[in-house]
UniProtKB/Swiss-Prot annotation:
Protein's name according to its UniProt entry: Homoserine O-succinyltransferase
Site (Important for substrate specificity): S192
Keywords, ordered alphabetically: Acyltransferase, Amino-acid biosynthesis, Cytoplasm, Methionine biosynthesis, Transferase
Organism from which the protein derives: Erwinia tasmaniensis (strain DSM 17950 / CFBP 7177 / CIP 109463 / NCPPB 4357 / Et1/99)
Entry-linked SUPFAM superfamilies: Class I glutamine amidotransferase-like
Length: 309
């Protein structure tokens, strides 16, 4: 799917160099097609890197996607130029009266921070409740899953004793589910989190359907029956070197991190790892866009039909 982005966004040239189909706003405006409107709430500090990762996964299907980037943390960023944020990101007040086909809420490095201490926790509440009336389907990733389970289902924050980091095998529980259509029976996906997602807790306290899980990671992929909410507790968007960068950052900071599981060749951090989850990530996002967004969203977004309580 050609993603439609502002002509000047740095991701345009970055992704084109990887042979990813990116359509600028100028070209897209000449096509008589309604693009899917997808809002990306980017909570990661290195926003440009995260943009590249998610836009790569949103790019491989035949329909246009009009990407809009959202920020809710107005503090000065130490990792992203203010010019970039001002040029390419919108504030919630700018979009609160608009409707969207899809919303993606990224992870955030807040695994050991209590929800009440998150600087933008009230804004997260506001966006999630706003999405009930204004978004066809929302996809939560990693920390955003934990936040959504707390806000929407009242599940307290669950924290692991040590950080889960590495590339893990997962098993499909419902092979005929739309979100896992085309998945291998077992597949690899990366994780990097302190958050814990016990499958039993989700089954006992929500009506969400779990589609994939792992003995080491817990629930990995689950969703609401009406397809309005989808949750992925890992990081299928990660580049091949993202876990490596996190490991070496923590090592150099003297944090004595564990070597990510099943990631570095021979468990040697000096050897360059290779991505073993790329096809899974592409298929997951394609399925979400097709079955949870495109197939159920109205042609005219003014005619939203919210079903969330």
């Amino acid at each position: 799917m050609p993603i439609r982005v502002p002509d000047e966004l740095p991701a345009v040239n970055f992704l084109r160099n990887e042979n990813v189909f990116v359509m600028t706003s100028t070209r897209a405006s000449t096509q008589m097609i309604r693009p899917l409107k997808v809002l990306v709430l980017n909570l990661m500090p290195k926003k440009i890197e995260t943009e590249n990762q998610f836009l790569r996964l949103l790019s491989n299907s035949p329909l246009q996607i009009d990407i809009q980037l959202l920020r809710i943390d107005t503090r000065e960023s130490r990792n992203t130029p203010s010019e970039h944020l001002n040029n390419f990101y919108r504030n919630f007040e700018d979009i609160q009266h608009d409707n969207y086909d899809g919303l993606i809420v990224t992870g955030a490095p807040l695994g050991l921070v209590d929800f009440c201490d998150v600087a933008y926790w009230p804004q997260i509440h506001k966006v999630l409740h706003w999405a009930k009336e204004h978004v066809t389907s929302t996809l939560f990733v990693c920390w955003a899953v934990q936040a959504a389970l707390n806000i929407l289902y009242g599940i307290p924050k669950q924290t692991r004793d040590s950080k889960l980091s590495g590339v893990f095998d997962h098993q499909i529980l419902h092979p005929h589910a739309l979100l896992t259509r085309g998945f291998d029976d077992t597949f690899l996906a990366p994780h990097s989190r302190y958050a814990d997602f016990p499958a039993g807790l989700i089954r006992d306290y929500t009506d969400l359907e779990i589609f994939a899980e792992s003995e080491q990671t817990g629930a990995y992929l689950f969703a609401s029956k009406d397809k309005r909410l989808a949750f992925v507790t890992g990081h299928p968007e990660y580049d091949a070197l993202t876990l490596s960068g996190e490991y070496h950052r923590d090592y150099e900071a003297g944090l004595n991190p564990e070597i990510p599981f099943n990631y570095f060749p021979q468990d040697n951090p000096q050897l360059e790892p290779r991505a073993s989850w790329r096809s899974h990530g592409n298929l997951l996002f394609s399925n979400w866009l097709n079955y949870y967004v495109y197939q159920i969203t109205p042609f005219d977004l003014r005619h939203m039909n919210p079903t969330l309580d």
